[in-house]
Amino acid sequence: MRGDGDGWYKGPGGVKHWGKFGAAGLLLRAPLPGGGSAVLLQHRAPWSHQGGTWALPGGARDSHESPEHAAVREAEEEAGIAADDLRVRAERLTMTAPSGWTYITVIADADKPLPTVANRESAELAWVPEDEVADLPLHPGFAAAWIELRAVPLRVRLDADTELADALPRTVELPDQGFFWLHARDDGPGAEVVLDGEPTEGPVLTRADVIA
């Protein structure tokens, strides 16, 4: 039922977390002109829990919702982002409380920094360059998770591969290596990676990783 997840989940010792069935948030990336990426962040309204901090659009999951459904819905409600304007890439469990309560971050990409419409839960919304996110006063939970959510930029050599060019830029998650922001700007940030090349000290990527 819509809205049945709103409320505090009370764990042992009276510790509370918002969302009776857990919570989810959307980490939405978009390309910047120089090849880097920006992340959509919400400056939380002063009256809200941890008001004045920066975090992801997100909130309580309803009983019938998947984490993806909840995160995308919350982004539309809190930031005016339509589901058709993003592509989900991955999910990451970013918090588990002793009570069993969980927070899941859904990672997605947009083709460009989209216009936003703030609701009453936001003091403002902003597309923040990825390398500047950690400089903001972040919500404690998001600050702890950002270390594993941040994407490292990599430059992909296209070699006239049009299918590959159409797939970039984008976020990719590699097992045991984390997230990477792939782009094709020769003068953009990050090291160059050769797809399907010989193993190096850096991340090993295949063409299939990019066009998946």
Predicted regions and their residues:
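Nuclease catalytic cores that cleave nucleic-acid phosphodiester bonds
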Residues: 163-212
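Conserved beta-strand scaffold positions in the cores of enzyme catalytic domains, especially
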Residues: 125-127, 155, 181-182, 204
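NUDIX/MutT-family hydrolases
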Residues: 116-150
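Metal-dependent nucleic-acid phosphoesterase active-site entry motif
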Residues: 154-166
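N-terminal leader/linker segments that precede catalytic domains of diphosphate-processing enzymes
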Residues: 1-53, 59-114, 130-131, 150-152, ...
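Short, Lys/Arg-rich amphipathic segments at extreme N-termini
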Residues: 6-12, 157-160, 172
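Compositionally biased accessory segments in Actinobacterial proteins
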Residues: 88-92, 153-155, 189-195
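Short hydrophobic segments within beta-strands
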Residues: 42, 157-159, 196
